[in-house]
Amino acid sequence: MSKKLHIKTWGCQMNEYDSSKMADLLDEYEGYTLTDNAEEADVLLLNTCSIREKAQEKVFHQLGRWKTLKDKKPELIIGVGGCVASQEGKAIKERAQCVDLIFGPQTLHRLPEMIDQIRAGKKAVIDVSFPEIEKFDRLPEPRADGPSAFVSIMEGCSKYCSFCVVPYTRGEEVSRPLDDIILEIAQLAEQGVREVNLLGQNVNAYRGATHDDEICTFAELLRYVAAIDGIDRLRFTTSHPIEFTQDIIDVYEDTPELVSFLHLPVQSGSDLILTQMKRGHMAIEYKSIIRRLRKARPDILISSDFIIGFPGESKQDFADTMKLIEDIQFDHSFSFIYSARPGTPAADLPDDVSLDEKKERLAILQDRITQQAMRYSRQMVGTVQRILVEGPSVKNPMELRGRTENSRVVNFEGMHKHIGKFVDVEIVDVYTNSLRGVFIRGEDEMDLRRDLRPSDITAKYKQTDDLGVSQFKPA
């Protein structure tokens, strides 16, 4: 009987990526298969997030539920990873004796050894260190799960915004070597992946080493990835305004694989609040980036992050944020009420905006952006959109579901042979959370560019060392 693994994941897309790597790692090295049922698992892993309020209490509530499973099954192994694990360390074990493993985002690759130590009789293993890029060297080859894939290009953040825990929980910025990223994407393309989303806490700070000890910028990386045959759509998340340089904007002008959609967090439209947040830019600088982007790519849509009720946020500060929203005309946002994160500089500021005021401002902001998003959706009616077909429609399995460049779900009638491929559809109707399309043409009628075959990369340049680590080595 195969061993079973259950992973519960909270938080950002990076955590989702990390959890998928944990599953691949334990499958390859330990033979574990994933299960959605915690009661039948041999190993339970909780991948935590410390961004939201009461993150620690949420963790201990979950561990309390899992303790009852361990009481019935003493050999059950329970592990806690992610940002709360990185923050709290051994304090988790002191409060929850049922926990066997505590590991940070940079040490998840050591899970097989940690599990072996517990099996050998060790009472607890705690490793929340920051071993830089070693994590990526030890992970198994990627496995495609559908036509779209996330690829981590860097870890950590060095910006130290006053409200954010990321530099303390994931460490400072560390970029993966260019060749490793290209090889991973080529391997995914060989498995049928058509869309890649480059992932990091601050992707546009990417500065990866090349095989000849030069430095590859983020703009250069985008062009390298776009040239790989089969990768016909390219996204990235998340970026920071202060490093959204002109060379990145230039890629939008000449690289059609890069989608006409950008998530660029701003957090506030008030210069005073931006200064308090230590964001390193003013509202006018943010608007300048968007203006230059729209000159390079007129149809680009923008989404952002907003924190509502930051300490000291006055009615005028909030009005400045709403003015920025009106000026930019955002298509989407992730917006939250401010709550202090322990250990951050902002936690020492007086939280002087009432909860009722925060809720009212949040509702106003979200309503405005929802209206703007619906307007953009209605403007798409009658247009032909290229979508990547992800699978059957959720509500009607006899239909298909795909996604536009600007991340809208489109349902349409079509043949299942189109799953995993691009099709063109005409948008004929708009709903709250999706669009309705009519099939126009399939991929065989498109003139998709072919530059660099993935097999040329994986076959010619792949080198594997004695430890089984594969690297991309240009000849």
From Swiss-Prot:
Positions of the Radical SAM core domain: 143-375
Q: Does the keyword Transcription apply?
A: no
Q: Does the keyword Transferase apply?
A: yes
Q: Name one GO cellular component term.
A: cytosol
Please list the residue ranges annotated as the TRAM domain: 378-441
Ligand binding ([4Fe-4S] cluster 1): C12, C49, C83
Spell out the molecular function terms from Gene Ontology.
4 iron, 4 sulfur cluster binding; metal ion binding; N6-isopentenyladenosine methylthiotransferase activity
Annotated [4Fe-4S] cluster 2 binding lies at C157, C161, C164
Pfam families in alphabetical order: Radical_SAM, TRAM, UPF0004
Per UniProt, residues of the MTTase N-terminal domain are: 3-120
Q: Which UniProt keywords apply?
A: 4Fe-4S, Cytoplasm, Iron, Iron-sulfur, Metal-binding, S-adenosyl-L-methionine, Transferase, tRNA processing
Catalytic reactions of this protein: N(6)-dimethylallyladenosine(37) in tRNA + (sulfur carrier)-SH + AH2 + 2 S-adenosyl-L-methionine = 2-methylsulfanyl-N(6)-dimethylallyladenosine(37) in tRNA + (sulfur carrier)-H + 5'-deoxyadenosine + L-methionine + A + S-adenosyl-L-homocysteine + 2 H(+)
Gene3D superfamilies per the record? Methylthiotransferase, N-terminal domain (3.40.50.12160), tm_1862 like domain (3.80.30.20)
EC number from the UniProt entry: 2.8.4.3
Cofactor comment: Binds 2 [4Fe-4S] clusters. One cluster is coordinated with 3 cysteines and an exchangeable S-adenosyl-L-methionine.
**Which superkingdom heads the taxonomic lineage of this protein's source?**
Bacteria
Q: What class of enzyme is it?
A: transferase
Q: Which cofactor does it need?
A: [4Fe-4S] cluster
Subunit annotation: Monomer.
Tell me, in a sentence or two, what this protein's role is: Catalyzes the methylthiolation of N6-(dimethylallyl)adenosine (i(6)A), leading to the formation of 2-methylthio-N6-(dimethylallyl)adenosine (ms(2)i(6)A) at position 37 in tRNAs that read codons beginning with uridine.
Q: Which NCBIfam families match?
A: miaB-methiolase, MiaB/RimO family radical SAM methylthiotransferase
According to UniProt, the name of this protein is: tRNA-2-methylthio-N(6)-dimethylallyladenosine synthase
Q: Which gene encodes it?
A: miaB
